Amino acid sequence: MRLSTAAALLTGFILAFSPAYDGCGPGRGYGKRRTPRKLTPLAYKQFSPNVAEKTLGASGRYEGKVTPSSERFKELTPNYNPDIIFKDEENTGADRMMTQRCKDKLNSLAISVMNLWPGVRLRVTEGWDEDGLHSEESLHYEGRAVDITTSDRDRNKYRMLARLAVEAGFDWVYYESKGHVHCSVKSEHSVAAKTGGCFPGRALVTMKDGSHRQIRDLQAGDLVLASEGSDGTGDLIYSEVLTFLDRRPITQKHFYVIRTEDGASVSLTAAHLLFMRVGNCSNRGEPKPGAVRTIFASDAQVGQCLLLGKLRKRFSQITHVGVREDQGLYPPLTAHGTVVVNDVLTSCYAAVNRQRLAHWAFAPLRLLYSWTGPDQVLKNGLHWYSQVLIGLGKLLLDSELFHPLALEATER
């Protein structure tokens, strides 16, 4: 009965209020296919995303050269896709060796190339490098990078080829030279964790009595420190924990570790939302209206100002961004849509960088719990409501609003 009631509430809210709907149909273009999104070719020397290749927002750090005798060589797999031509100048098959993630993206790109240019195939000129011919710390040494052209070597196609590579899911694409496009991916065991947004089980929240409790020990109905405004504004208050949007006690994942100059340190997955200061860190006092924005954890950079929430709200400059493996996945949902974790004010939401939209989307669930009380039984796994919203979001929202890893997780 509870499930059907909440489903009805969800449907009603979406049909009544969603700006993505027009008229009586289920969205823009009801009764006909959507017009395909026009692809914009990359310019010469342009790279996407617009950050350096070996930053966490792109393909991530260099992790060391992979050689045939190294333990990590087992991470590489040969690609024998007949729709891809491998130049293989060394005649060793080295260009065919790559990580599984790189292989998946390359195979996807090969299909796009044949669809756009019938009779033309994807061509790989450089893959894994075991000879040390590339620059220091090149991702070619790890099997995480490829240099590509088209089989007809028509350089007029390379700008669009770069765009197709972006669409295929490469984590960094660079129209590097007139002769090829460079593409790379995250490492297999880096932050390519296929999850939405979560905290590790040992993350600490602040209880109403001032004590700290590990997030894995939280129960529905507990009061935890949060922000009165779902957008990070307002006073610090104690908000009721309604449920967990996901709960996986024994899962091992890689988390971003973000530290500030004040000693605060929070661990969370790539797609989780954090509150940051708009602009520079010249004023690190309490946030004023319009001074707060959200970013994905994977976009956090040293020098940015993170919003803390200990005795009062204040900004603190980020001094370190790293990656660490930890156990457990726990994203709590509070009544106010925020929660202070390890003295850092964070969102309860992830996957889509629209805090107000996310808080609005969970309004039916909060309304349900206001009638029935918080979840009495906390089950492991992804909450059914989160699954519904992800499915609806993929139908209604532009894919560019999603974090790449969160969107990828829904497609598996």
UniProtKB/Swiss-Prot annotation:
Alphabetic keyword roster: Autocatalytic cleavage, Calcium, Cell membrane, Developmental protein, Endoplasmic reticulum, Golgi apparatus, Hydrolase, Lipoprotein, Membrane, Metal-binding, Palmitate, Protease, Secreted, Signal, Transferase, Zinc
Gene Ontology molecular functions: calcium ion binding; cholesterol-protein transferase activity; patched binding; peptidase activity; very-low-density lipoprotein particle binding
Binding site for Ca(2+) 1: E89, E90, D95, T125, E126
PROSITE patterns reported in the protein's UniProt record: INTEIN_N_TER
Site location (Cleavage): G197, C198
Residues marked Involved in auto-cleavage (site): T269
Endoplasmic reticulum in keyword set: yes
Marked site (Essential for auto-cleavage) residue numbers: H272
EC number(s) given by UniProt: 3.1.-.-
Family in the record: Belongs to the hedgehog family.
Protein name: Indian hedgehog B protein
Species of provenance: Danio rerio
